[in-house]
């Protein structure tokens, strides 16, 4: 799934 972290201003894809 896609997880976005606003406070780090980035998105990662982990299932």
From Swiss-Prot:
GO terms for cellular component: extracellular region. It is found in: Secreted. Expressed by the venom gland. It comes from the Eukaryota. The keyword Secreted applies. One of its GO terms (molecular function) is calcium channel regulator activity. Keywords: Calcium channel impairing toxin, Disulfide bond, Ion channel impairing toxin, Knottin, Neurotoxin, Secreted, Toxin, Voltage-gated calcium channel impairing toxin. Coiled coil: none annotated. The keyword Magnesium does not apply. Its main location: secreted. Modulates Cav2.1/CACNA1A voltage-gated calcium channels (P/Q-type currents) in rat cerebellar Purkinje cells and hippocampal CA1-CA3 neurons. At saturating concentrations (>10 nM) decelerates activation kinetics and slightly increases peak amplitude without affecting deactivation kinetics. In vivo, does not cause death when intravenously injected into mice. In rat models, through its activity on Cav2.1/CACNA1A, has an ameliorative effect on memory defects provoked by hyperstimulation of N-methyl-D-aspartate receptors (NMDARs) in the hippocampus. The primary structure of this fragment is identical to that of Omega-lycotoxin-Am1a from Alopecosa marikovskyi (AC P85079). The presence of a 'disulfide through disulfide knot' structurally defines this protein as a knottin. Belongs to the neurotoxin omega-lctx family. This is Omega-lycotoxin-Lp1a.
């Amino acid at each position: 799934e896609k997880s976005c972290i606003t406070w780090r201003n980035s998105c990662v894809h982990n299932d």
